């Protein structure tokens, strides 16, 4: 499948060896395919829909029944006993029954719809796993930044206390540093909780516990703009989006249901036949007698519905209203796809600019912190200035980290909206991960 745009640009992208690191995106996705309840449920529904085709086709085939019986009759009015042995085979074959053909066609379309929904759920699983995975990495990065900020503010607090003891700083500087340090401690508690919850969200999908994941290789990470316009992408989505395809089939099924309901006005023709054998014996005090019979029959039966109390007309109207509803659902699905394609395409292009800006913001914030610390040492800047500069540096790092993950997810979301999201995309993203440092 042709890729929409590269996620990572590198001379050589090798997938992570499972012998070195098992808990990467590809491994977790494979676990999700085997254990995700949503996917397994939709798979079972798809199998049921295909089995319904066989059930609908059976109505067009001969219906053959074998019967047999042995009955003993006794009477109190006369000292006699009669035994009846019977057997028979009968068949019925529809020659014309419009509803049976429509039902078969509808069942086949529902099977295709279920297959499309299953494929859409597979794509949804890729996106759900990717979102949950990168939420863990996002929370992990945030915790690392908070802990780094805590260490930096802690050093500044100790330096401020020392300066206060020798008379170089006011007590208010100590209080300001202590206040920010306490705030960072609270942020650390929240960040740890967020990481725990993000791991739990990943466990919900696969049923497996995780403690450490492969991380994004930021040195090899590169973002690129989409090469096609939103209108060109929308055109592709019209043909390939799986949810849109399922909505179209749903409209077709609703149209067939009108035909199915109106077929109640049409006659039906069946070929019926059979063979029956019977042996009836009577036993009384005077004599023993019996009779045997063999019956053969075959014929064509016509059934014409003349009046059903208005039921057929009512069912037809219900089906017509349902068709209108399905048509509106299709229009809503189309508009949603158009919105998603444009939004995700815009998000990708916006992320490119944001990534560049955040990269520069990190450089600028680092330089600003160094300059502010130097100014504080010579008395031209206050501890509040240093603390603010420290916070800006770690905020810039967090924003840059978030922007990378947002870009990757936007690319995957766009591919899902177009209908091209596949397992190859999982492998492409997985190739941009690396073993985390201990």
Curated annotation (Swiss-Prot):
Biological process annotations from GO: response to antibiotic
Pfam families: OEP
Leader sequence segment: 1-22
Keyword Signal assigned: yes
Subcellular location: Cell outer membrane
UniProt similarity note: Belongs to the outer membrane factor (OMF) (TC 1.B.17) family.
UniProt name for this protein: Outer membrane protein TolC
Biological source species: Vibrio cholerae serotype O1 (strain ATCC 39315 / El Tor Inaba N16961)
Lineage per the UniProt record: Bacteria, Pseudomonadati, Pseudomonadota, Gammaproteobacteria, Vibrionales
